Curated annotation (Swiss-Prot):
Residues 421-495 form the DEP domain. This is Segment polarity protein dishevelled homolog DVL-3. Residues 212-224, 629-645 have a biased composition (Basic residues). The lineage of its organism: Eukaryota, Metazoa, Chordata, Craniata, Vertebrata. GO terms for molecular function: beta-catenin binding; frizzled binding. GO terms for biological process: canonical Wnt signaling pathway; ciliary basal body organization; cilium assembly; intracellular signal transduction. Residues 248-333 form the PDZ domain. GO terms for cellular component: cytosol. Residues 173-189, 564-579 have a biased composition (Low complexity). It is found in: Cytoplasm. Residues 89-235, 552-653 are annotated as: Disordered. It comes from Xenopus laevis (African clawed frog). SUPFAM superfamilies: PDZ domain-like, Ubiquitin-like, Winged helix' DNA-binding domain. Residues 140-155, 580-593, 602-618 have a biased composition (Basic and acidic residues).
Amino acid sequence: MGETKVIYHLDEQETPYLVKLPVPAEKVTLGDFKNILNKPNYKFFFKSMDDDFGVVKEEISDDNAKLPCFNGRVVCWLVSADGSQSDAGSVCADIQSDLPPPIERTGGIGDSRPPSFHPNTRGSQENLDNETETDSVVSARRERPGRKETSEHATRINGTSKMERRRDTGGYESSSTLMSSELDSTSFFDSDEDDSTSRFSNSTEQSSASRLMRRHKRRRRKPKAPQIERSSSFSSITDSTMSLNIITVTLNMEKYNFLGISIVGQSNERGDGGIYIGSIMKGGAVAADGRIEPGDMLLQVNDTNFENMSNDDAVRVLRDIVHKPGPITLTVAKCWDPSPRNCFTLPRSEPIRPIDPAAWVSHTAAMTGTYPAYGMSPSMSTITSTSSSITSSIPETERFDDFQLSIHSDMVTIVKAMSSSESGLEVRDRMWLKITIPNAFIGSDVVDWLYHHVEGFTDRREARKYASNLLKAGYIRHTVNKITFSEQCYYIFGDLCGNMANLSLNDHDGSSGTSDQDTLAPLPHPGAAPWPIAFQYQYPLPHPYSPHPGFPDPAYIYGGGSAGSQHSEGSRSSGSNRSSTEKRKDRETKGGDSKSGGSGSESDHTTRSSLRRDRAASERSVPASEHSHRSHHSIAHSIRSHHTHQSFGPPGIPPLYGAPMMMMPAPVSVMGPPGAPPSRDLASVPPELTASRQSFRMAMGNPSEFFVDVIKEFWGV
């Protein structure tokens, strides 16, 4: 009797293995090789000769197939199946009775399934086989002692006894089901049940869909004592996943413009394996229904069954049905997601954000009153939004439920409600081109939120137009500052919403004389008293006063003067708009003192007026030192007189009406903000520095005139 040498390579190992089969080379089969090798979880590729390609590696899976032989030996490559991690040993087989052999799959819906597919209900067993494309079978055993009697006469599968299967409908028991999912290799499943056979696949009468198990590690059992009648499950999948869950969804296409699904076809060498839901688009009929999910298997559309239908035909039929008017009925088999996303995620209404230490400290300080209150109303409190990390000043009683939103509401109110943590808008960190966008939201979510929470929109298009107006107004902002609104883009809340912490709604008291005035002022002088950060209303700046070139230069007053100029100071500092005629009358009543400074107050210290007075003084043969002394004395007298009169303007803020160079010196602040530098009265400044300081202020007030006067002085004009 001849023998055959078989050289086989195992996976990626460099050194091949050699076994000898006691069978002649012309009669050796794959079953003979498997009996010697006993490696059930491998694919077998043999060196073969093809007429078109020459020497190739041919996969052989039929145990009765003869092996190709070259020079009296067989060369084989063993490749482990994907996801297969089995131990060596034999697998227990059914030894109950002779069953008809499995029906060969002819291609159809049950031919191939993605690993995430799982059924949840039981149905009839019509037109159903229990063998998948990987030759996986289900067997049952009632009595263990019969194994030795029949195992020698049974055919072999993967080096183990292959018993003929019995077709029977039966229930499931969690303690008796053995499951494995060697998708790409020849394997089988057995079950120890007393009264019924555990089925690996089943279907309903209308779908005849088979189920493909998720790939799992299969452990082969060692022979047990005869008295053990049951065995526990080797799989982590419970019996609730062993049944097929089929749902029928009827969609009303009159309310929606499109179906909103993408389909994926599954195919293999034996034919097409069915149509599956690839993705679901927002705004479609399927997304609005919510019961169909990605990965579900599409079994039937209206009255058209997709069984034994190719993928191309199924797509064509589905396209024709969608184009027809009327409702659409979809019958799908639910899938089982191996990586659920919603089990351990937080609900949308309670988003969690990383702790911002600065916001935490400021919030705690505001609650405990550590910082001085700069115009905070007692009914106001600082609330940190967890959804958008925006620190905004809103009343304690103002919550999302209190907002009565309509299309006539202010945009600020709508955006404030949208940014609330209880609004329902999904605001979280997003990834875009590997860039993390903190606290972002999708444009389509904004449109949906506006359409459902703001009254007055007749359709979704109006809500989208309103969202576009929010973008143009700056209440929401694109990550790259695009001004065109798109529902597929990410957006964040704009600066107008983020800077609400700077708003102050308190009314100023009348102690400073500004209770009846509307003023717009810059930040106060460091030595001045604290002033509110912002105002409720903003008025346009008044037009600066500019005398006609033909008129003589008026005497611009910086502070209070003598008793005769008290009315002039009070009216100007309070911001009243006096006409130029009244100003000229005041100067006429003051006599000729305006030539030397205007009734004892500080005269115009711009460079232009200073140079003109110097030239006039030289013509009258008045010493410059006398003019300088008189001018400094006027400054000191002006400061002293300023403290004797009532101030009618905000501290440290220039009057709004009059020439642009009018400016009052800041009074001495009794109480300054924390950390402010100590201030010094202008009267205590040395005389040689006072004039320079005032001249610098005048030059900064109107630098163009300063430049012209310097040019004139240089050329002696």
